[in-house]
Amino acid sequence: MTSPSTRPTLTPALLVLLALLSAFTPLSIDMYLPALPVIAVDLHGTAGDIQLTLSAFMIAFGVGQIFYGPAGDRFGRRPVILIGLAIYVVTSIGCAFALEAGHLIGLRLLQGLAACGGVVLARTMVRDLAEKDQAARAMSLMMACTSIAPMLAPLIGGQILWFLGWRAIFWVLALIGFVALALAYVRLPETLRPEYRQPLVLSAILRRFGELFRHRAFMGYAFTSSFMFAALLSFLSGSPFVFIERYGIAPRAYGLVFGGMVVFMTVGSLLNAKFAPVFGAGKILRYAVWVPAITGPIAMVLGWIEARYGTIGIWPFFLCFGPQIATISLIGPNSMAMALQRYPHMAGTASSLMGVMQFGLGAAFGAVVGQTFDGTIAPMTTAMGIAGALCLVSHRVLVRRG
C-alpha cells in the first residue's frame, strides 16, 4: 500500500498538466470550427455532412469513456493516458490527409476515441488526490486553465485557415498531442492506490455500472451536467454556420465571437473555485441550474421570432448565451465532485459513465442542430432552450428527491 508520505500531491504543476490533458476536447473541436464551411466546400459535402465530423468525435469521445474508466481503475491512470495520447497523434495526422467527408467523419471518430482517455482520467486523478469541495475547487481551477483553449483555439484555427488551409489545423493538433505525450511520459505520476485497483472483468464492470445506475442522486448529477453539456454542444454545432453564413462574420473573426463566450465560462470557473470551498458544491449547484432554465427558453423564443419575422440582431442572443455558457463552469465541476464523492473505489468508472452521458447527449443534440439547420438561428436556440430546461428538471427531480 502506498504510504501518505510517498503518494503524489495535487501540486500546481500537476494541475496544469491535467488541465492540458482536459483541453483536448476544446482543442479538437474549437480549433477547426471556423473551417467547417470551407471543409464542406473542399470535400464536396453538405453542412450536415461536415457537422457530423463534430458529432462523430463527440459520440466516440463519450463511448470511449466506457472503456477508459474501467481500464484506468485496473491498470492505473498513467499507462492508459499515454496510450490514448499516442493514438491521438496518429489519428490527427490521418485527419490532415482526408480526401472525402466520409473519410474525415471516420477519422474524427477514431480521434475522439483516442482523446477521451486523458480527459476522463484527468478528472479521476483529481478525485484520487482531493475530496468533495476541494475536488470541486481543483476541477474549477483546472477548468479555468482549460478554458484558455476554447478561447484561443478558434482564433488560432482561423489564422491557420487563412494562411495555411484547414488541413494544417490537424497538423497542429498532432503536434500538441505529441507535446502532451512527452510531458505526460516525463511528469505524470500514478495516482491510483493499489487497494483501489478493480478487476477488468466484464461481469465486474457491469456490476459497477449497475450500482451507479441504481443510485438516484448520482444519475441526477449525471443528467444535470449532461443536459448542460448538450446546450454547449448545440451552440458549438450551430454557431459557425449561424454566425458566418447568416450574420456574415468572417471565419477569422469568428474566433473573437467565440472567445467572448469563453470569457463568461472562465469567469464562472474562477468564481466557483473561490466559493465552492466556502458555500459547498451542492449549494452552488442548486442555484446555478436556474440560469440555463431561464436564459435558454428566452433565447429559444427569440429564435422563433427571428425565424418568422426576420433578423433582430445578434446582441439579444448574446445576452442569453453568455450567462448560460458561464454556468457550465458552475454546473459541470460541482456535479462531477458531488457525484464522485461516494465512489472513491471506482472513481474511474463513475467518471467514465458521466462522460458517456455528457458526450452522448451532447452529440445527439449537436447532430439534431446540424441536420435541422435551415439558415436561421432557431434550431440552435431551440436545442439550447430544451437542454437548459431539462438541466433544472434533472436536478429538481433526481437530486433533490434522491
Feature-to-residue mapping (PLM):
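Juxtamembrane intracellular "pre-TM" segments in multi-pass secondary transporters
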Residues: T2-R7, P189-Y221
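Extracellular/periplasmic helix-loop-helix junction of adjacent transmembrane segments
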Residues: A35-G64
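Helix-breaking motifs and short loop linkers at transmembrane-helix boundaries and internal kinks
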Residues: D42-H44, G76, F97-H103, A114, ...
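Conserved MFS/SLC helix-loop-helix module at the cytosolic interface between two early adjacent transmembrane helices
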Residues: V63-G102
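C-terminal ends and interior cores of transmembrane alpha-helices
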Residues: A86-L99, P292-Y309
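Paired small-residue
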Residues: I87-G94, G102-L110, W315-C320
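Helix-loop-helix hairpin linking two adjacent transmembrane segments in secondary transporters
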Residues: L99, H103, L141-V186
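Cytoplasmic helix-loop-helix junction between adjacent transmembrane helices
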Residues: L107-I148
